[in-house]
């Protein structure tokens, strides 16, 4: 609504800490399909998708549980995908799940299996619970396997990775994954010391910061990999095709974006007012 994207499809996709990789894969496939249909019918334009990873884990963190409360943070990050017929961009994505590990990382109550009640609240069952050792063993196996699968699909080798962007779970997991892939430490990006584990937001935040720091150059091979509750895991290999250096954010561009945002806000306000009038029995114009 605030963006003014009133004709765009919008939906939530939940896959725990792997959510951003899932969203990336789904969005890439959708805009590729939309763009191919447009090309077939003579419309020379590609699809565009905005993929957002966002989480507020502080709402479900038990601050009396020292095993989990020091790990998590809140955050949000986003990327824009644009269809392009040339080589590059997202090369391959893999998505997996294993429901047998659902109890390793979960919110015990509040869902359909155990609805909220006075008892569940009193027993503090609406907070995140994690079996850390089992999650660690799963992560250090699943992340390298996911990376190798997307590399194979992309006809690439591990030594061709310019930068690995893993889900920022904990430093030991990141180091173990990098070691399993024989990657130098400087090829495994980490910003854990600033934000902690921000779930689905961790990969887009890390990707954005790595690009801002100049760690990703045009035509670099970048692999994003994540794992999370479910259990879920996934990876996406891409060849960085964003033109660098990026277009500078001049005062005119900032003013233009601010004006567009203000226009979208006013339009939304008018539409809501019209709907309110209609609900009061006034005929819609």
Model-identified regions with their sequence ranges:
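Claisen-condensing/thiolase-fold acyl-transfer catalytic domains that form or cleave C-C bonds
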Residues: 6, 13-37, 140, 144, ...
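Short beta-strand segments
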Residues: 14, 49-55, 72, 81-82, ...
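Acidic-glycine-rich active-site phosphate/pyrophosphate-binding loop
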Residues: 1-4, 51-57, 112-120, 173-185
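Acyl-CoA/ACP chain-elongation machinery
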Residues: 53-54, 59, 98-104, 171
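Conserved beta-strand scaffold positions in the cores of enzyme catalytic domains, especially
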Residues: 10-12, 51, 90, 188
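Condensing-enzyme catalytic core mediating Claisen C-C bond formation in acyl metabolism
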Residues: 65-137, 141, 145, 239-285
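Flexible, glycine-rich active-site loops centered on histidine and acidic residues
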Residues: 28-36, 41-76
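Nucleotide donor/acceptor-binding cores
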Residues: 8, 45-48, 220
């Amino acid at each position: 609504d605030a963006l003014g994207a009133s004709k765009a499809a919008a939906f939530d996709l939940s896959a725990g800490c792997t959510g951003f990789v899932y969203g990336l894969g789904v969005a890439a496939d959708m805009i590729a399909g939309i763009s191919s249909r447009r090309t077939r019918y003579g419309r020379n334009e590609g699809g565009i998708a905005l993929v957002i990873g966002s989480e507020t884990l502080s709402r479900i963190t038990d601050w009396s549980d020292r095993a989990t409360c020091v790990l998590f943070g809140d955050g949000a990050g986003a990327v824009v995908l644009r269809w392009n017929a040339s080589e590059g961009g997202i090369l391959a994505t893999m998505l997996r799940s294993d429901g047998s590990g659902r109890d390793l990382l979960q919110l015990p109550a509040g869902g359909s299996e155990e609805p909220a009640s006075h008892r569940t609240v009193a027993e503090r069952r609406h907070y995140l619970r994690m079996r850390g050792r089992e999650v660690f063993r799963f992560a250090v196996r699943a992340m390298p396997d996911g990376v190798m699968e997307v590399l194979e699909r992309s006809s690439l080798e591990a030594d061709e990775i310019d930068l690995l962007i893993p889900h920022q779970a904990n430093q030991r997991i990141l180091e173990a994954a990098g070691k399993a892939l024989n990657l130098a430490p400087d090829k495994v990006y980490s910003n854990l010391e600033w934000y902690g584990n921000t779930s689905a937001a961790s990969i887009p935040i890390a990707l954005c910061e790595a690009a801002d720091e100049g760690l990703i150059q045009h035509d670099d091979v970048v692999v994003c990999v994540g794992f999370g509750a479910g259990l879920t895991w996934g990876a996406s290999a891409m060849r960085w095709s964003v033109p660098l250096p990026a277009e500078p954010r001049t005062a005119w561009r900032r003013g233009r974006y601010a004006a567009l945002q203000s226009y979208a806000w006013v339009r939304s306000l008018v539409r809501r007012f019209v709907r309110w009038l209609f609900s009061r029995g006034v005929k819609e114009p």
